[in-house]
Amino acid sequence: MSEIIQDLSLEDVLGDRFGRYSKYIIQERALPDVRDGLKPVQRRILYAMYSSGNTHDKNFRKSAKTVGDVIGQYHPHGDSSVYEAMVRLSQDWKLRHVLIEMHGNNGSIDNDPPAAMRYTEAKLSLLAEELLRDINKETVSFIPNYDDTTLEPMVLPSRFPNLLVNGSTGISAGYATDIPPHNLAEVIQATLKYIDNPDITVNQLMKYIKGPDFPTGGIIQGIDGIKKAYESGKGRIIVRSKVEEETLRNGRKQLIITEIPYEVNKSSLVKRIDELRADKKVDGIVEVRDETDRTGLRIAIELKKDVNSESIKNYLYKNSDLQISYNFNMVAISDGRPKLMGIRQIIDSYLNHQIEVVANRTKFELDNAEKRMHIVEGLIKALSILDKVIELIRSSKNKRDAKENLIEVYEFTEEQAEAIVMLQLYRLTNTDIVALEGEHKELEALIKQLRHILDNHDALLNVIKEELNEIKKKFKSERLSLIEAEIEEIKIDKEVMVPSEEVILSMTRHGYIKRTSIRSFNASGVEDIGLKDGDSLLKHQEVNTQDTVLVFTNKGRYLFIPVHKLADIRWKELGQHVSQIVPIEEDEVVINVFNEKDFNTDAFYVFATQNGMIKKSTVPLFKTTRFNKPLIATKVKENDDLISVMRFEKDQLITVITNKGMSLTYNTSELSDTGLRAAGVKSINLKAEDFVVMTEGVSENDTILMATQRGSLKRISFKILQVAKRAQRGITLLKELKKNPHRIVAAHVVTGEHSQYTLYSKSNEEHGLINDIHKSEQYTNGSFIVDTDDFGEVIDMYIS
């Protein structure tokens, strides 16, 4: 064999060879493909496990066998690099959703090495199989392996956006990549929105993808950094540990760390904090303990008495990996080249891949369906002339002769003739003839559907959306990482992080609050709300997750609760008591609840108390940044209670009704705007031992429904009310009796929205229709509805 010797300069040879090497490690080793989010070794591991039947529904198999398969067929490198990649795919502190399930020691968050491959066992996770689904339907291209003995996929079908879900990290020649993991449900929702609107902005996408979602949890800060990374591919965020404070029996406090930043070595973190203690870099730490066990991660930092725990925590954030900065560098292989990509480009590349995958699969299924249709048509034709076919076959010399005769005499095709001669005798029954005709109809429908998908781009996109929704429904999980953005520090509107969604807000009279999806509400209906015995619905309305709920109590206080912080609970289930969200006193009860979309409004609230005080305050006064404690809405004096809170867009008439049957109607224009801590002015001039039972807005078309303790209901029209001035005594609405006089225990303004009433005693309740109560004159006591001897004395009434 003759040798060819080239005379080349060392500079040219080194440049050329290093260029080839760089291209190889960039494309074939260190960087993931944007379409399936996998590096070549990861793809080969998953494909080797799939093709050998090592799937989630089978038994675990020795890891060494998989490593051998990968090295022998696809990846001619050392076994350690393959095993390390395989182990990483099984580590739930590295991947948001593991792609391999592993039995045995697969390492730890302390960076302990895994057991040798001969000891551990593994199989594909259920989600990993979604990356490989339909790979046998010619959905992706295959190339020869390194020795041309078999084929391997260039990319996996990847039925979910794995690059964003599990992220990636790697270093190659001249390139590095750091893509954080995200929440699967959020990523899929953003992809669906992108399909619906390819011009969607990054800001709009961030309503669905709130930010990274690390498998180790933690707290993410820096929404500007997230937005910048999603726009350009590069950005910086802060990731800090979740730290809580506990008090020990001896009065000391300790900081408890339950979540640490992504890819931080826990044992190194504990060691670093202990070094800071030992070196007396920080004064006040007694001991650092790693209390992690099978129940979860836990690091305890015991503090000296009377030290400022907040200062120590801040010091540790600054001087240890209790807080780190994470730098986005979203580089991936796209069209065979490394590219720095924003989130829109990543989703777009993934979507184009899915369009190709679904189109290829549809073509494959269409081809198979058409081939089968051709066979079925031949079988049906043969069965229609069965006797002649049998006679022809019997007269033939052999199988080949029979096929040729069928083709020549009856014009069957080669494929149809083959199917006919292979037909078994038992298939000639009437049942199988009917089955073939049924299969023919099904194939016709399937072929029509598949052709529609191929001919109609929107139909193809709908298939992608349906399959993404299925995966979202099957594999969605709660977000692990909390995203915080303090307005003063980050300078960004927090609303960007809250997905805009219309929901149903509900509040019960006993203080149970929840938000419910409109779908759950519509499926159940108002009447099927989950309630405790004796409780009833106070209010429900459609709100947005970006709105704020103001909950007012009888103590004159209000709770400021962003809607998105309310628990998302099904309509038929019991809500969350407001005291679990914001602590309130035991004898504090909810009076009313209102939803605010924008506090920059001219609307105002009117507050009325039992002892006849009233106050007006504008809505902007109620905006706050404090969510963790009740705030003052109005000053309520001792031995008094707030009984009514109303919200008006402009001045209007209100009616006051008292226990002894007095009524005063006047306009809110008589009230001056006051601050939140003011007690207000006199609403009505009360008689001795009288008190207010109702203060509500009223208009000309309304009626008033009143209930007395003796079981009587009285309904009057608006015209009986006499508009007067504030602080007067008003008019009498009851006929005075010397013996056992009627006293009004409850009253409500009836509008067109109300149709039913409910009367309550201590042990009974009575329901009825408001329209059944006839309107009365001014000086009457109404009509008896219940017998108090049986029902008990009436103590309250609600309308709905």
UniProtKB/Swiss-Prot annotation:
Pfam families: DNA_gyraseA_C (PF03989), DNA_topoisoIV (PF00521). One of its GO terms (cellular component) is DNA topoisomerase type II (double strand cut, ATP-hydrolyzing) complex. The record marks 39, 75, 77, 88, 94 as: Interaction with DNA. InterPro entries: GyrA/parC_rep, Gyrase/topoIV_suA_C, Topo_IIA-like_dom_sf, Topo_IIA_A/C_ab, Topo_IIA_A_a_sf, Topo_IIA_dom_A, TopoIV_A_Gpos, Type_II_DNA_Topoisomerases. It is a peripheral membrane protein. It comes from the Bacteria. This is DNA topoisomerase 4 subunit A. It comes from Staphylococcus aureus (strain NCTC 8325 / PS 47). The gene is parC.
